[in-house]
Amino acid sequence: DSIALLDLISPYFKEIVCVYMYVVKDLSHINRYINYACNKYPNVKYIQIPHFSVYSFRRIGYLGCVENEKQKLYNMAQLTDIVREKYNVEWAFFGFKQSDSMNRRLMLRTYKLNGINEVQKKCYPLSEYRNKDVLEYISRKGLIKPESYDLKHQSSGTDITDINYLLFLRGKFPEDLKKVINEYPLVERKLFEYDHERAKAK
């Protein structure tokens, strides 16, 4: 969604601050998208911050990551406000779609044109798009294609609990998988259990 969103809004602003929220920092399969965007859109600046889920992961030592019981928790709105203040950003744009979930559909339909929250200065240009529409837009504009984990699974970001994502990394980006396991050691157990079940089924 971020690929289409950036292309849609880039002609209308002098400067765009793109925020990539990472679960594991500096993964090569993510960096290639960031590099692509920075080269294609001269008015874009990329910053990287931890995904809001990372703070709760650290609080409980999720999947073996370094635990910090005193870790402060943040949500999406709080992180948005932090970035806005630091980079002097007036309007925030998001790739949320009504088709993503019931909650998003209900939220987006309360806004002007189903996608403009004038009070909070937040905008959702993809509100009425479906996944199919986003992929058609990307194809029509000749943009970089999103990763596909396999024939049935489109990328949904770095979901370290998704076995399809982990298998994708193991097959195509083994160095990235090492970085994931280094941060979240128990991820390796998920792969071990998957391989064990496959071996038993043979």
Question: Across the structure, where does each feature detected by a protein language model lie?
Answer:
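Nucleotide-activated chemistry modules centered on ATP-dependent adenylation/adenylyltransferase
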Residues: D1-K202
